[in-house]
C-alpha cells in the first residue's frame, strides 16, 4: 500500500488542533469568569463597599478579595469565589478516611469517584448557602457603613443569597469543565486567574506609593528582589526529585528474552503541589470571614475578637496556617500516592529496589523515603507562604506579593506548561505510530 502524501502533516495538525481547542476553551472560560466578576449583586452601594475594603487593607477580607479575583470589592455574584467548593472538598476527603461507607465508595473506582464528586457538589451548595446568608445578613450591620445596603429587607437577603450561591455553583461547574475539556486543574486555574487579574493594579499601586514617597525606593527594590527570589526557589524545588534506583532482572516472555535493565522511580519533593496552600487558606478564610462579617453586630463581640486573632500576621493566624499547610501536605500526598500499590506494581513487572526485598519491604522503604520528602516539601511550602508574608506585612505592600499568591501562580503555570508539553508529545507519538503502521502496510 502506497503512503498517502500529507498524512503525517494532517496527523500532526490534528494533534495541534486538539491542543488549540483546549487552549481556546480555557481562555474562553476565563473570559466568562472575568465578565462574571463584574456583575454586581442588586441592592449594594459599590462606592460604600470600596470604602469598606479600603479600611480593611492588610486584613483577612483583602486576602479573600484576592482569591475571588476582586469580585468581593465589586460586590459581584462571584464574591464567594471557589472557596466553598474547596472547603467542601476538604471535608469530603477527610470523611473518606474516617467514615467506612465513604471509604468503601472511594474504592469503587470510576463510579466511586463520581459519587464522591456528587457529594462534594452537595457540600459546596450547603456551604455556599451558609456563607452567603452570613454575608447578606452581615453587610447591613457593618459598623460605620450606613448606606452599604440600599434597601435592607427580605428582598435584598433573598436576592443576595441566590446570586452568591448561583455564582459559586457556576464557578464550580466552570472549573470542572476546564479540567475535563481544557488544560490543567480547573479550580487552580480559576484561583490563578483571580490572583493574576489583581497583579497589575497591585504593581501600579506599589509604584505609585514609591513615587509619592510613602514607600522607600530601596524597599520597592527589595520587594522586586524578593519576588524573583521566591519564584526561582519555587521553580527549583518543584522540579526537584528523589530518584530511587530500580532494577529489572533478565526475563523471558514467550520467545523474546529481555536483558537486565536499570532505571529509577522519580519521587517529587513536593508531590502535593499547590493544594496544601489553597486548602490551608480556605480553612483560615472560612471562620475568619464569617467572624469579620458578624463581628460588628450587637452581642457578637466575641466574633470580633476571633476575627482580630485570625488576621494575617497575628500569632494564632501564623500557627494555624502553618499547621494546616503541614497537615494537608501529608494528607494530600497520602491521597495521591500509595507506596504499597507502587511496590506491588514493581513486583508484578519483575522490578526490585537493590538491597530491598520485593513486596512489603519495598513498600515500607518507599513510604519512609516519601515521608521524609513530604516533610521537606511541607517545610518548603510553609517557608514560602509565611516568610514573605512577614516581610509583606512589614513593608505594607499588597497581598499579591505574598508567598501564597506567588506559590499558586508559579506552580499553576508550571503544571499548565507540563500538560501542554504532554499533549504535544502524545500527538507526536500518535503521528509516529500511524507512520509506522503505514510503513508496515506498504511492505
Curated annotation (Swiss-Prot):
Keywords from the named record: Cell inner membrane, Cell membrane, Membrane, Protein transport, Translocation, Transmembrane, Transmembrane helix, Transport
The keyword Transport belongs to this UniProt entry's keyword annotation: yes
GO biological process entries: intracellular protein transmembrane transport; intracellular protein transport; protein insertion into membrane from inner side; protein transport by the Sec complex; SRP-dependent cotranslational protein targeting to membrane, translocation
Intramembrane region positions: 61-70, 71-76, 77-96
Effect after changing residue 167 to E: In secY100; temperature-sensitive
Periplasmic side: 36-60, 132-164, 201-223, 288-313, 396
Stretches assigned to the Cytoplasmic side: 1-22, 97-115, 179-183, 238-273, 330-380, 414-443
Protein's name in the database: Protein translocase subunit SecY
Natural source organism: Escherichia coli (strain K12)
Amino acid at each position: 500500500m502506497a503512503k498517502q502524501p500529507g498524512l503525517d502533516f494532517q496527523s500532526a495538525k490534528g494533534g495541534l488542533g486538539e491542543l488549540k481547542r483546549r487552549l481556546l476553551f480555557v481562555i474562553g472560560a476565563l473570559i466568562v469568569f472575568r465578565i462574571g466578576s463584574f456583575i454586581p449583586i442588586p441592592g449594594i452601594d459599590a462606592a460604600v463597599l470600596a470604602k469598606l475594603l479600603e479600611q480593611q487593607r492588610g486584613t483577612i477580607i483583602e486576602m479573600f478579595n484576592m482569591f475571588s479575583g476582586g469580585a468581593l470589592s465589586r460586590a459581584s455574584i462571584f464574591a464567594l469565589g471557589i472557596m466553598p467548593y474547596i472547603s467542601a472538598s476538604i471535608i469530603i476527603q477527610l470523611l473518606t478516611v474516617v467514615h467506612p461507607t465513604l471509604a468503601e465508595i472511594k474504592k469503587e473506582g470510576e463510579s466511586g469517584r463520581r459519587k464522591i464528586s456528587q457529594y462534594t457538589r452537595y457540600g459546596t451548595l450547603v456551604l455556599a448557602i451558609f456563607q452567603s446568608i452570613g454575608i447578606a445578613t452581615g453587610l447591613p450591620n457593618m459598623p460605620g457603613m450606613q448606606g452599604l445596603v440600599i434597601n435592607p429587607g427580605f428582598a435584598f437577603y433573598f436576592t443576595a443569597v441566590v446570586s452568591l450561591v448561583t455564582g459559586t455553583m457556576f464557578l464550580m461547574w466552570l472549573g470542572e469543565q476546564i479540567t475535563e475539556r481544557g488544560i490543567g486543574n480547573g479550580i487552580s486555574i480559576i484561583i490563578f486567574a483571580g490572583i493574576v487579574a489583581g497583579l497589575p493594579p497591585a504593581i501600579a499601586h506599589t509604584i505609585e506609593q514609591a513615587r509619592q514617597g510613602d514607600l522607600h525606593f530601596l524597599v520597592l527594590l527589595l520587594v522586586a528582589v524578593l519576588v524573583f527570589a521566591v519564584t526561582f526557589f519555587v521553580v527549583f524545588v518543584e522540579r526537584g526529585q528523589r530518584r530511587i534506583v530500580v532494577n529489572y532482572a533478565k526475563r523471558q516472555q514467550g520467545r523474546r528474552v529481555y536483558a537486565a535493565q536499570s532505571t529509577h522511580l522519580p519521587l517529587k519533593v513536593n508531590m502535593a503541589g499547590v493544594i496544601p496552600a489553597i486548602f490551608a487558606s480556605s480553612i483560615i478564610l472560612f471562620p475568619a470571614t464569617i467572624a469579620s462579617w458578624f463581628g460588628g453586630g450587637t452581642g457578637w463581640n466575641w466574633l470580633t475578637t476571633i476575627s482580630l486573632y485570625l488576621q494575617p500576621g497575628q500569632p494564632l493566624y501564623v500557627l494555624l496556617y502553618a499547621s494546616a499547610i503541614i497537615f494537608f501536605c501529608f494528607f494530600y500526598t497520602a491521597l495521591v500516592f500509595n507506596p504499597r500499590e507502587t511496590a506491588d506494581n514493581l513486583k508484578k513487572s519483575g522490578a526490585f529496589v537493590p538491597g530491598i526485598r520485593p513486596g512489603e519491604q519495598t513498600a515500607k522503604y518507599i513510604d519512609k523515603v516519601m515521608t521524609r520528602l513530604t516533610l521537606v516539601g511541607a517545610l518548603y511550602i510553609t517557608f514560602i507562604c509565611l516568610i514573605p508574608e512577614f516581610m509583606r506585612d512589614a513593608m505594607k505592600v499588597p497581598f499579591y506579593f505574598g508567598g501564597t499568591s506567588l506559590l499558586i501562580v508559579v506552580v499553576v503555570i508550571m503544571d499548565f506548561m507540563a500538560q501542554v508539553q504532554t499533549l504535544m508529545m502524545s500527538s507526536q507519538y500518535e503521528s509516529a505510530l500511524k507512520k509506522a503502521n503505514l510503513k508496515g502496510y506498504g511492505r
